[in-house]
Amino acid sequence: MKIIVTKDNIEGGTKAFEIIKKGMEDGDKVLGLATGSSPIPLYDDMCDSDLDFSDMTSINLDEYYGLNPDNDQSYHYFMQKHLFDKKPFKHSYIPNGMAKDIDEEVDRYNDIIAANPIDIQILGIGRNGHIAFNEPGTPFGSLTHKVQLTESTIKANSRFFDNEDEVPRQAICMGIKSIMQSKKIVLLAFGESKQDAVKALVEGPVTEEVPASILQDHPDVTVICDEVAAAKLDPKYRN
């Protein structure tokens, strides 16, 4: 695991962009993408670059179940706004949150991932160490699955909605095993609220109670965090 400590999230986004650019130069064709505030500086750099993604495939980690893609809180909407409107990909896969049969959609998404092995997976991390909607206790062997959102996640996400009742209770999420099958993983973490999660990710035991801790067992992981998020790390892990 490589740790890169930056002064802020803007520099962190640039470091992640450099990894993607190098990967594309080396022939990478499939990017695993995340939503949330952490990857926005990366997507800004991608949009501002002269890179052409029209021959690339993207696969997103997750989507709320029950939200129309046009809803401004859907992850479809997020990706269009922050990346795809300016930089279209050849194929852009995101779970269908309006699928009539959620189990069929889970199977369909697993097939998509199997047919398009991910070269570089971008991740964020939650305060409790979750990655995507894989909350503490999610089996490390999980593939794409439907998720009942925890009360803490519903409360955390309620700030994006008019009230807590509007927050979806279910999501479709790429599983931890699927994430671990990516050739390279780049995890982004910025701000004081991520200090404990970063420390557990890097230093703690590998346990399903901290889903991100499994990344210690991946052969090619880069953690990019700002100085604040890295504040609790043992100095030996900082470069």
UniProtKB/Swiss-Prot annotation:
It is an enzyme of class 3 (hydrolase). CDD domains: GlcN6P_deaminase. One of its GO terms (biological process) is carbohydrate metabolic process. Pfam families: Glucosamine_iso. The active site is at D62 (proton acceptor), N128 (for ring-opening step), H130 (proton acceptor), E135 (for ring-opening step). The keyword Hydrolase applies. GO terms for molecular function: glucosamine-6-phosphate deaminase activity; identical protein binding. It catalyses: alpha-D-glucosamine 6-phosphate + H2O = beta-D-fructose 6-phosphate + NH4(+). Gene3D superfamilies: 3.40.50.1360. Keywords: Carbohydrate metabolism, Hydrolase. Transmembrane segments: none annotated. Pathway: Amino-sugar metabolism; N-acetylneuraminate degradation; D-fructose 6-phosphate from N-acetylneuraminate: step 5/5. HAMAP family: GlcN6P_deamin. Catalyzes the reversible isomerization-deamination of glucosamine 6-phosphate (GlcN6P) to form fructose 6-phosphate (Fru6P) and ammonium ion. Belongs to the glucosamine/galactosamine-6-phosphate isomerase family. NagB subfamily. This is Glucosamine-6-phosphate deaminase. It comes from Lactobacillus johnsonii (strain CNCM I-12250 / La1 / NCC 533). The lineage of its organism: Bacteria, Bacillati, Bacillota, Bacilli, Lactobacillales. The gene is nagB.
